[in-house]
Amino acid sequence: MAERVVLAYSGGLDTSVGIGWLKDATGKEVVALAVDVGQGGEDMEVIRQRALDCGAVEAVVVDAKDEFADDYIVPALKANALYQKRYPLVSGLSRPLIAKHLARVAHELGANSVAHGCTGKGNDQVRFEAAVAALAPDLTSIAPVRDLALTRDKAIVYANEHDLPIEQSKKSPYSIDKNVWGRAVETGFLEDPWNGPIEDLYEYTQDPDVLRDATEVTITFEAGVPVAIDGVRYSPLRIVQELNAAAGAHGIGRIDVVEDRLVGIKSREVYEAPAAMTLIEAHEELESLTIERDLGRYKRGVEKDWANLVYDGLWFSGLKRSLDAFIEDSQRHVSGDIRMTLRGGRAVVTGRRSESSLYDFDLATYDTGDTFDQSLSKGFIELWSLPSKISARRDLAVEQAALAADPAPAAE
């Protein structure tokens, strides 16, 4: 039996041509694996058949939408994950899931290697290969686009020469990646960071400058997990889908950013993530109601580290697992409802409530019924500021001693 390689297959130009390139370069049979993470577009059966028509000996399709939402999006939401405070890890979350299925299918079918269609300039090559190395160190990773210096022009020529069933042209300069958590667009005229994005660039969101009647939604969380919209319970996947539609209609979740890639360069990216940005805003607001101050402060540092690890392709690392444990414990009381108004590109919180709330009305009110004993504040302030007072006295004494030992020269 010939050796096999399992290719992460998207149905696009690079991975369709990659089937033939892999066969020619390695002599191995190519198994195509297409993973549905909610990217939409073509039917997965059409993609499966295209892989076979392009020369794959077998094509496997995995519906991983619910798995993606439950096991990748939900942890990211609990972590309020935003790389460099802006990017909700659209691609960074899907790559370890795809890599997991690459490793699984490779072992099930007796393949000794896996492959992907990433270039040598991006983050995804690292994410795929680091994940495979962590899950299946016996497998080798092949990157034909990177390792064989295969350009888009060469891919188009190859596709035409071999009559591959794909329609591609040089007129589409963008590189696009999308899943149910968001959509990423790069290259083309966006490579000049002075060029503003045009409206035709967007797919998940409507123009936020075209005002529509506001939409009000109430999102319910249980232990950090979104479980309902307006009192109707849904799966995490369905909640993301519903909010993509509702928030996207108001242009919420558009992000235009220059970010630092893992490989050492800066890259201009445009993202659309209506559900992601709405849910993160709601989740953060509920945490402000239910998490004590010190835990919240510390968690913000953990959130940054968590997002960096995932962005850098270390989903399966020991540190990531340890941070997961901390974040999971922090969510025990993050249950309740957040009411939001969606309009004009913004998701604005207008109400919050929780049976686990740390907000005590009787302590917070300035009206009759106030139970806060203000007489205790004077002593609290005295003790709280005592270290600063002692330090200031010390500094003043040292300064005075220095002046006494070395007085300023008398003026002539």
Curated annotation (Swiss-Prot):
Instruction: Please give the GO cellular component terms listed in this UniProt entry.
Output: cytoplasm
- Could you tell me where this protein is found in the cell? Cytoplasm
Q: Which gene encodes it?
A: argG
Q: Does the keyword ATP-binding apply?
A: yes
Give me the reactions it catalyses.
L-citrulline + L-aspartate + ATP = 2-(N(omega)-L-arginino)succinate + AMP + diphosphate + H(+)
What the record says about family reads: Belongs to the argininosuccinate synthase family. Type 1 subfamily.
The UniProt annotation places L-aspartate binding at T119, N123, D124
Q: Which residues bind ATP?
A: A8, Y9, S10, G11, G12, L13, D14, T15, S16, G117
Which residues does L-citrulline bind? Y87, N123, R127, S175, E259, Y271
* One GO BP annotation of this record: argininosuccinate metabolic process
Q: What is the protein's given name?
A: Argininosuccinate synthase
